[in-house]
Amino acid sequence: MSQKPHLNLIVIGHVDHGKSTLIGRLLMDRGFIDEKTVKEAEEAAKKLGKDSEKYAFLMDRLKEERERGVTINLSFMRFETRKYFFTVIDAPGHRDFVKNMITGASQADAAILVVSAKKGEYEAGMSAEGQTREHIILSKTMGINQVIVAINKMDLADTPYDEKRFKEIVDTVSKFMKSFGFDMNKVKFVPVVAPDGDNVTHKSTKMPWYNGPTLEELLDQLEIPPKPVDKPLRIPIQEVYSISGVGVVPVGRIESGVLKVGDKIVFMPVGKIGEVRSIETHHTKIDKAEPGDNIGFNVRGVEKKDVKRGDVAGSVQNPPTVADEFTAQVIVIWHPTAVGVGYTPVLHVHTASIACRVSEITSRIDPKTGKEAEKNPQFIKAGDSAIVKFKPIKELVAEKFREFPALGRFAMRDMGKTVGVGVIIDVKPRKVEVK
């Protein structure tokens, strides 16, 4: 593991705008893909007569390997710049990309948004159905504020390498992002040609009008978000083991606060209190754990039957909230008909998956302005954004997104698909007896 500070990166943008090619090029230029793999990809691309596609082939090769569960050279999805160590959380084009983006085990610290400068492609991405728009909205909803917009395929603009086309795209994308509340000081634009590596890790000679930083230099300008150590402790439980001679060992990732040996903690929704006897991360004993740490911890006073995946451990003084009902801003991504009161999808919130009933649709939101477009609509359909109240069918820990982001965002699943995504604005707590 690198000693450099670590950032999680997500790569977003419309289909075919060159996300895979860009990441492939970046990883290769930084020496994180070996020559042999590059040669194989080059040959595969030549056979199909698509020489410029070799970097995308690299990414596809990786994806196949990942989906088959074979881990070839996983440094593939990790790379270093001069300043940082990056993990690409999710490469694009993945089936569950949107769901992963929301319930992703790790919150992305920054995004690269890839936008094609090619006529027709750019416009398709920004159309009502376009993924450029959808991914911009999702990034903001998910609390990703640092974005590098890579305007790709500059060689395929009507006038190749045209500064006017670059400025036109910067202008419209900026307006759109601004309308969703992005702080434009944290959004940077760079013109690139991914297959040739122009402005990826080296300055392009073909666009002398651009004298800003390369993509790699922009990655080094990103900021590391502060760890929420001062917030109350929250650990969504992923698994629970019972180890002979040790006892009960819940496993999870600390989302906020600090856990120390000797601490008294409470598991919700059961309301069971235990004392931390030991903490381990990657088979190493530690005395305290902080946000971002994946840990196993042994607890005295708790039995295996008391704790399960989806529960949340927290501080006794400020226990995790069990929701009687909660209000969320939801975006419907897909639904064959419409969503109305009574609809009960399964909500994936942190590590929990619980059926929740729509008890009220308060308002439909105009996605362009973020303002109310209709009060108490009867139903909402794909593409709509709305304020919705949910009633969990079983006990569920849920928090406000602005207080605990990882416990306040969710994906709605039904019929094997992601129906929508949302962030929790308000929670009506249920009283739980702590024992």
Swiss-Prot record:
UniProt-annotated stretches for the region G3: 90-93
Top-level class of the enzyme under EC nomenclature: hydrolase
Region G4, annotated ranges: 152-155
Recorded GO CC terms: cytoplasm
Entry-linked Gene3D superfamilies: P-loop containing nucleotide triphosphate hydrolases, Translation factors
Main location: cytoplasm
Binding site for GTP: 13-20, 90-94, 152-155
Reaction it catalyzes: GTP + H2O = GDP + phosphate + H(+)
UniProt-listed PROSITE patterns: G_TR_1 (PS00301), G_TR_2 (PS51722)
Region (G1) residue spans: 13-20
Enzyme Commission code: 3.6.5.3
Subcellular location: Cytoplasm
Region G2, residue ranges: 69-73
Keyword field: Cytoplasm, Elongation factor, GTP-binding, Hydrolase, Magnesium, Metal-binding, Nucleotide-binding, Protein biosynthesis
Binding site for Mg(2+): 20
Pfam family, one: GTP_EFTU_D2
Molecular function in Gene Ontology: GTP binding; GTPase activity; translation elongation factor activity
Occurrences of domain tr-type G (ranges): 4-229
Region (G5): 193-195
UniProt function note: GTP hydrolase that promotes the GTP-dependent binding of aminoacyl-tRNA to the A-site of ribosomes during protein biosynthesis.
UniProt similarity note: Belongs to the TRAFAC class translation factor GTPase superfamily. Classic translation factor GTPase family. EF-Tu/EF-1A subfamily.
Protein name: Elongation factor 1-alpha
